[in-house]
Design a protein with these regions (language model features):
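Glycine-biased, small-residue-rich flexible motifs in mid-sequence functional cores and linkers
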Residues: 12-195
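Long amphipathic alpha-helical segments
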Residues: 1-8, 18
Length: 195
């Protein structure tokens, strides 16, 4: 039984797929932004981004207890209502929102600041595995083997907003990475809300 479980886990991580901007499964909303990537690398079901509306939920890594509850509840509401939850798998708000969406049976799209073969942060790998098990996807604009660098987090933020119809900020400092996502939402004419 243990061997079967390990094989099943390994299978989730085996195949990295590529989606070009001219392909039908490239996220339609992402096609509309000026600085879209020409190629996306992904695992899982990227089609969810064209089948259902998506909402990005982002916020502080160092989240308060109230913020954690709000992020979880926001994720749960998004999941229960048939929307995709999009974020970057970061500690704090991102992780709590993903947990809420997954617990509600929702689908999630995680945008990574590195190659798809590396989950960042490693402590959230179990969440990434749950995203795949529940029919979601992991996405990156970077090829396998690309390490997470500071500037790649900002680049990831534009994709989180770009593939969503709206961005919900739960908690954030004025000069935080979350504010990059909020700025991209404004530039990309996405709905922006604070919770």
């Amino acid at each position: 039984m243990e061997k079967l479980m390990e094989e099943k886990k390994t299978t989730l991580w085996q195949e990295i797929k590529i989606c070009r901007v001219d392909e039908t499964n490239y996220p339609h909303d992402l096609k509309k932004i000026k600085d879209r990537p020409e190629v996306l690398y992904y695992r899982g079901n990227i089609d969810i981004l064209n089948e259902h509306k998506s909402i990005a939920v982002v916020g502080s890594r160092k989240i308060s207890a109230v913020g954690a509850k709000l992020a979880y509840n926001a994720g749960s509401i998004i999941g229960k209502n048939g929307f995709n939850l999009v974020n970057g798998l970061a500690l704090g708000c991102d992780a709590e929102a993903l947990k809420g969406a997954l617990a509600a049976g929702g689908k999630c799209a995680v945008v990574l600041p590195c190659g798809i073969n590396e989950i960042y942060p490693k402590s959230n790998q179990w969440i990434a595995e749950e995203v795949l098990k529940q029919g979601g996807c992991l996405i990156s604009e970077y090829p396998e083997g690309t390490r997470p660098e500071k500037y790649r987090f900002v680049q990831r933020d534009r994709l989180q907003s770009g593939m969503s119809q709206g961005v919900l900020v739960v908690e954030a400092m004025e000069k935080s990475g979350t504010m990059h996502t909020a700025e991209y939402a404004k530039k990309q004419n996405r709905r922006l809300a604070c919770y």
